[in-house]
Amino acid sequence: MKILVTGGAGYIGSHTCVELLNNDYEVVVVDNLYNSCEEALNRVEKITGKTLTFYEGDLLDQDLLEEIFDNERPEAVIHFAGYKAVGESVEKPIEYYHNNITGTLLLCDVMRRYDCKKIVFSSSATVYGDPAFVPITEDCPKGVITNPYGQTKSMIEQILIDIQVSDPEWNVTLLRYFNPIGAHSSGLIGEDPKGIPNNLVPYIARVAVGKLEKLGVFGNDYDTPDGTGVRDYIHVVDLAAGHVQALRDMKQGVSIYNLGTGQGYSVLDVVKAYSKACGKEIPYEIKPRRAGDIAACYSDPTKAKEELGWKAKYGIEEMCRDSYHWQSMNPDGYQTKQEQA
């Protein structure tokens, strides 16, 4: 079965390509390399000993999409492509809505014309806003979303639901991720944010290898056990395996699944686990809360276990261990010394 993976050179996309190839799927990737690097795909091939097909380009390029579908005839799409920085989305709402929404609409239009009606969408727990209750089940109402990035995830979910209502032949699976961290155990692929990392673990990783001085912990006065924000962290390899299960068990209609461990960890829990993984203290300082941050957000992943047979295998210590292994082997990410020169 041939799968088109949009944004397949990115962090979650590249790990999912590994799982797909290891499960004997044919993989075609389209990625504009805005947030990613082609080297990740070379390493996916090295890890798996298999080849994939890569098209560099944008979902906003309809001619390219038609060329891909003409040449490859994929049977299903896993859709990761999109701008993804919360802070940047507040500064650049027009770019975020145009890229993420218009790109998805063009993709779905070409899929429809080529009779490819199976899509797994990379959504996010951000659609729950400040959740009405925790742990969060899939029927938790969507909350107030405080940034354009989160709004695009919620809007794309609704677009895909509406497409499926209009044409029952569509199979739509919406995967709401919690907080993916970690890296492939080989240390060959991992998270490589450009510039100063926005997310907690890549930031800690840069501190651990001496690239950054110390971690800023935003708020220690939340209503949580140690006062710092609590999140559900999930190993990226577990998350990638969830996509393969979702693809394997696709059915007509719309299916929605939370992908998380069901376990909440505070910022300081993660700092402690990372210190253990790297064998050194992670210096940090407490800073004021960030606007829009919530106290606690963690999943109830029961539905994915019952319907997909999927369950996270890795705990926070393995997540931090694999993150540190990746960062130690690749202190400058995918960038080579020649590129830096």
Where do the protein language model's features map onto the residues?
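N-terminal Rossmann-like NAD(P)+-binding domain of SDR-like oxidoreductases, especially those catalyzing
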Residues: 1-183
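Short, flexible, glycine-rich and Lys/Arg-enriched loop motifs at helix boundaries
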Residues: 38, 168, 179-199, 210-231
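Glycine-rich, flexible loop/turn motifs
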Residues: 40, 86, 132, 138, ...
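Residue-level signature of the cytosolic catalytic core of signaling kinases
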Residues: 57, 196-197, 263, 312
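Short-chain dehydrogenase/reductase
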Residues: 97, 146-154, 190, 194-198, ...
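A general boundary/transition motif marking the beginning of the first structured unit of a protein
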Residues: 112, 191-196, 292, 311
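C-terminal substrate-binding subdomain of Rossmann-fold SDR/epimerase-dehydratase oxidoreductases
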Residues: 203-341
